[in-house]
Amino acid sequence: MKTRNVAMMLSVALAASAARAVNYTWNSSSGGDLLDQTNYTPAGLPTASDTVTYNIDANYRLTASGDVPSHGPQTFSKGEIELDLGGHVWDAGSKYFYLNNPLLTLSSGMLTNLSQLVVSRTSPNARLVVTNGSTFKVSGQVVVGNDASSSHGGIVVADEGTTFSAVGGTVIGASGPFSALTVSDGARYSDANLTIGNVTTAVSNIVQVLNGSTVDTVSLEVKTHGNALIISNGSHVTASSAVNFAKAETCSSNRLEVWAGSTLHAGATKKPFAFGVGPDNVMLVDASSISVADTYFTLGADATGSGNRLDVRNGSSFHVDSWIACQGSFNEMHFSDPGTEIVSESQLLIGQPGVGNVVSIGNQASASVFGVSISYSAGSQSNVLEVADGARVDVNGKDLQIGVGGGASRLTIDGGSITNVLTVQMAAKRNVAGKDNNLLEIVNGGRLFANSTVYFGGVGNSNNVIRVAGAGSVLKNHDSYMSWASSSTNTVMYVEDAALVDIATTLAIGGAGGSGNAMIVSNATVKAGNAVSVNGVANLDIIGSGSSLTTSSDFTLTADATLRFVSDDEGFGKVVSGNRLNATEGAKLVIDGARVAKSGGGTFELLVGPELAKQYNTSNPLVNNVTLVPEDSELIVTRDAKQNIVNVSVRVPSKRSGIVVIVR
């Protein structure tokens, strides 16, 4: 019995010894067949429970005479090794590969079923190259730059037919800096998520997708600073979920570049595309496209994002299925060049919230958005939209808002156009409190076309300015009115230098309870399809002989309102009314002919219209409260047989100085 027990114990011990993992080492510096047991020390073929270390400091090639069965974990410590599997498959048996050697190249065949791939685990400069139509599959995670000392590690996936997949995702720069992933020359790379720069020590990493290559991932994140994603020469990157580029406040000086017919598509699962949470990040799209499906895009992703920049140029397209937002502080979006197109299925939001953000659309670029809002949120300040040099913005029948929630903001249309606007809201909607110091300017042939109402100023706010200047510059609404909000102060519209303001129905300058409001027309044209009124303490100035204001209905001055004509060297402009002149007691008429007097004087029509005779009369307060410059000018009021006024003119005496010639 005792002998039997000893025999059984010996049998169990031998079985356990046979099952114990063996630590193999590759021993051939000239390379060889992975299925040749003499290439290992101890001699034998590794199994799934064994480990293998490659630590010969030499250049050599590993081949396979057949499919390679599952090994245990593999560690490549030294040397430059080519893995040439031919048409065979190496099944890693759900074990890891660690690369600390300078170079491992898979040049043919398939390496599959890795649980994890770590490149530059504890040392710098390790690289993995997958090329020549081979296949590399990792069931877990791919990590490049595993600790803070493992810098300059990288993966290269190259050539048509070459594929690399990482089911557990990819981290380029897990802890170490200067890590890289390059996918080039028609290769394909896919993973669950792509992270560039994972912790604060992992900086200055780069992912390049070049020359017709493809990367498919679920989410894309950049978490540190100095990193880059470059997509170029007809390459394509798809992130089916969220894109968070420069994800934290510490993420600065990162770059996303899409070049030469390449594409970046994001957000198929309704996750946002957030770019530039931290400062000073740049996105450049050149002759390429970015599309964001079922979600929104933000530059300066919250109030902390500052100094970030987006440039879309040279015929590129930027298409977002939801809204586009430029927020945070001092962030900039620039869209330019013929063929460049911006499409948002929702609003373009500038400064919501934020300070000092700029969006410019120029040089014949085009945009289609469903509403524009500049400084919509409370606390937003000094945000800017510029549309210039033949650029076009179609607002698709939605509102254009400037300074509704925040102030000191600007919309400049400089030789560009904004069309198909529902309402224009400067500082606020009608009779709603708004903010101060906003500017709308339409210059150098710029055009703003609204379908409905144009509102200027908000209740109790002040110092908003509208300027329409230059030949070809037009502010027009098609079927409604333009008005100043009640009790707004110092809201001034300048119409200058051959510009046109064309209002479909009523024009109301100033509001009841307001003060300092004005419309100043200087050698330009204003048209109203219905009545014109000047309300509260407000001015209408008609400056220069090239100016005119025409209304097809009543022209009304309330108490304390002033109509002022100022001459140039040629004479005065005109107000042409299609119906009666209404003037409440206290309304004022000022006629300043100082300049035309110096050029010789003359007689000039000021108020004309075929139906004035119906309502003008000798007691009209306007013609009884007149200030004339020079004082010896003469107001000429022409009446019909019933003593109704039909014309108001002024005769200005000549104040031309004599010329003295001195002959020596």
Please place each PLM-identified region on the residue numbering.
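Sec-dependent, cleavable N-terminal signal peptides
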Residues: 1-23, 664
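Feature marks extracellular polysaccharide-active and adherence modules
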Residues: 55, 84-86, 100, 107, ...
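Small-residue (G/S/T/A) turn/hinge positions that recur once per unit in extracellular repeat modules
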Residues: 79, 87-88, 102, 109-110, ...
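Extracellular, surface-exposed repeat architectures
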Residues: 65-116, 134, 213, 218, ...
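Extracellular beta-strand/loop-rich repeat segments of large surface/secreted proteins
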Residues: 53, 383, 434, 438, ...
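Solvent-exposed adhesion/ligand-recognition segments of exported proteins
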Residues: 18-101, 121, 570, 595-664
